[in-house]
Design a protein with these regions (language model features):
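Flexible loop/turn connectors
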Residues: 236-237, 246-365
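Short, well-structured alpha-helical segments in soluble
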Residues: 105-115, 224-236
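Glycine-rich phosphate-binding loop signature in dinucleotide/nucleotide-binding domains
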Residues: 47, 172-176, 231-237
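Alpha-helical recognition/docking segments in bacterial nutrient-uptake
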Residues: 2-3, 65-170
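Hinge/beta->alpha junction and helix N-cap segments in small-molecule ligand-binding domains
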Residues: 71-79, 102-107, 157-167, 182-227, ...
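N-terminal helix-turn-helix DNA-binding module of bacterial transcription factors
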Residues: 1-64, 365
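Short beta-strand segments enriched in small/hydrophobic residues
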Residues: 21-23, 58-74, 171, 179-186
């Protein structure tokens, strides 16, 4: 059996039942005793049986495709591109094509006839397309939970986003920060909501007032730079900035450089009179036109999303590696498992992240 493709008949013979019983047991249909169903599934797994995708689609009037819905701002973010590649690769292993859905509110009402299932990534409560997708009548897996009103998704793959920001805040504190700031994303996605809530709860738990600023979900480096300049000018005691949106950390570095802040340390490097090392004045104020900012009070910089922008920055930026390709693959795998009756339609799986410490927080690169 192991030298060729395992067939339904092979499973039936090994389990001592008919082909129709095997088919019903694996599809969750028909009148099959639970003990028999469990035995058939165990035998199928032991033999390495995989259903024929084409035959299964014919039996179920399947389209052979699944849909992928990304946030409207996703097209310019490296994170979502890698996530999509991972999802496509995994879907193809089950003989399924991946269809990228337009970010349109009208898509959900017609989608059930076009795809067998849906991946809805970082669903926003304010996204008009999401409710229709979640209620389209096909299995749905969300990448992070949907927090808006709906009948609810079929399943989800989630990250512990509260834990990842907690790890960043703990890290910069261990490196000497006493007044951290968080540039958290706006919006009502589970990721954005968790980061804002965690910044507040961490501050309360540690007796520290975290300077929380809200930036767009997909803030550009220029937007991050503007927000950081305003923050450090108004509150020069801030000695660590954690930037959430993908790819925006270089803007924080530019703001720090412009204001004479030495990235990678919390120690002062400026004048002994408490200036920012730019020739006098209030700490955190920009240098006079025509002058060059010298190394002033330190600033630790970190990011909630790792990627080329953080790894290639000068200095490289400490960041949370969310492993987007693996995450996309995990979402697609859960949907494939649901479509093939390998798992329950309300399954929730967790996805692991890692903290990559680099020179921007005084850590070896």
């Amino acid at each position: 059996v192991t030298s060729r493709t395992v067939t339904l008949l092979d499973v039936a013979r090994a389990a001592g039942v008919s082909k129709s019983t095997v088919s019903d047991a694996l599809q969750g249909s028909g009148r099959v005793a639970e003990a028999t169903r469990d035995r058939v599934r165990a035998v199928a797994e032991e033999l390495g049986y995989r259903p024929n995708s084409a035959a299964r689609r014919l039996r179920r009037a399947s389209t052979g495709a699944v849909g992928l819905h990304l946030p409207a701002t996703a097209t310019r973010l490296d994170y979502y591109m890698n996530l999509a590649f991972g999802a496509v690769e995994r879907a193809q292993e089950d003989g399924l094509d991946m269809v990228l859905l337009a970010p349109s509110g009208a898509a959900g009402g017609r989608i059930a006839s076009r795809v067998d299932g849906l991946l809805v990534i970082d669903p926003e409560a304010g996204d008009s397309a999401v409710p229709g997708l979640l209620d389209a009548g096909v299995p749905v897996v969300t990448g992070e939970r949907y927090l808006g009103p709906s009948a609810g998704p079929s399943a989800a793959v989630v990250c512990d986003n509260a834990a990842s920001l907690t790890a960043l805040l703990d890290h910069v504190t261990e490196r000497g920060a006493r007044r951290p700031a968080v540039l958290a994303p706006s919006g009502s996605s589970a990721w954005a909501t968790a980061l804002r809530a965690t910044a507040r709860s961490w501050g309360l738990a540690h007796g520290v007032e975290v300077a929380l600023r809200t930036v767009p979900f997909a803030a550009t480096p220029a937007e991050a730079e503007e927000t950081t300049r305003a923050l450090l000018t108004a509150d020069p005691a801030v000695d660590a900035v954690i930037c959430a949106p993908d790819g925006s950390a270089p803007g924080v570095l530019r703001a720090a450089t412009a204001l004479g802040r030495e990235v990678g340390t919390t120690g002062g490097g400026g004048g002994t009179d408490g200036s920012n090392g730019t020739g006098g004045g209030t700490p955190g104020t920009p240098p006079e036109p025509g002058t060059v900012a010298r190394s002033g009070p330190g600033l630790l910089v970190a990011a909630c999303v790792d990627g080329p922008a953080t790894r290639g920055a000068a200095p490289p930026v400490t960041a949370v590696d969310l492993r987007p390709a693996a995450y996309g693959r995990a979402c697609a795998e859960l949907l494939c498992d649901i479509l093939a009756d390998r798992t329950a339609p309300d399954t929730v799986r967790r996805h692991a992240w890692s903290l990559e410490t680099r020179a921007s927080t005084g850590s070896p690169g």
